Amino acid sequence: MTLKNKSIVVLLSGGLDSSTVTGIAKKSEAKIFGLSFDYGQRHKKELYSASIIAKHFNIEEFKIIKLDLSLWGGSSLTDTQKNIPLEGVQTNKIPNTYVPGRNTIFISVALSYAEAIDADFIGLGVNALDYSGYPDCRPDYIKKFQELADLANKRGRENNPIKLWTPLLDLNKEEIIKLAYSNHVPLEKTWSCYSGYSKPCGKCDSCRIRNDAYEKWLNNNNKK
């Protein structure tokens, strides 16, 4: 798949994964249109990081969409009455940081935007190996959403579908960090923490997964 001179809408949250996708697209000489969401999340600092990444890569356009999912909550990221789990990553359990329907909503908005500007791809930083168990970050979800997207708009019906591009889907977080460096992503400017503090808490799932991967990458790098 070549991205050179193609238009791509990237869901840019400001985190490690979406910033890496942006870096890969930039290095591939794609025309990047960034889309971020102010959805009532407690970690709004990610929006600042998203804007920094957008400027760093000098993308074509960057939009922040206001879409308040805190109106009905259902997640510790959008409901401050719920505590973010800090006891460590648990396997085979979907944590309460899962936001009901978030990726489905975000990708749907991105699909509308992509069709409106005649973009060829939607770039997603979803990752199936080191994720926290979210149902909307898995390969079967991406496959089914692509099938839906092909039916849901004019381009799809005319056999020129907008494709979901998920370059990180089968990578572990250590591999993503390596890819981030090779694509000139300023990792110090990205934001992964869920807790909403001015500095990363180091205890939430997102911090733990990122920090563990960084230590592995650092150790492996020092051995070379």
Curated annotation (Swiss-Prot):
GO terms for molecular function: ATP binding; ligase activity, forming carbon-nitrogen bonds; zinc ion binding. Its EC number is 6.3.4.20. Its cofactor is Zn(2+). Keywords: ATP-binding, Ligase, Metal-binding, Nucleotide-binding, Queuosine biosynthesis, Zinc. Binds 1 zinc ion per subunit. GO terms for biological process: queuosine biosynthetic process. Zn(2+) binds at residues 193, 201, 204, 207. Pathway: Purine metabolism; 7-cyano-7-deazaguanine biosynthesis. InterPro entries: QueC, Rossmann-like_a/b/a_fold. The keyword ATP-binding applies. Pfam families: QueC (PF06508). Transmembrane segments: none annotated. It comes from the Bacteria. ATP binds at residues 12-22. It is an enzyme of class 6 (ligase). It catalyses: 7-carboxy-7-deazaguanine + NH4(+) + ATP = 7-cyano-7-deazaguanine + ADP + phosphate + H2O + H(+). NCBIfam families: 7-cyano-7-deazaguanine synthase QueC. Catalyzes the ATP-dependent conversion of 7-carboxy-7-deazaguanine (CDG) to 7-cyano-7-deazaguanine (preQ(0)). Belongs to the QueC family. This is 7-cyano-7-deazaguanine synthase.
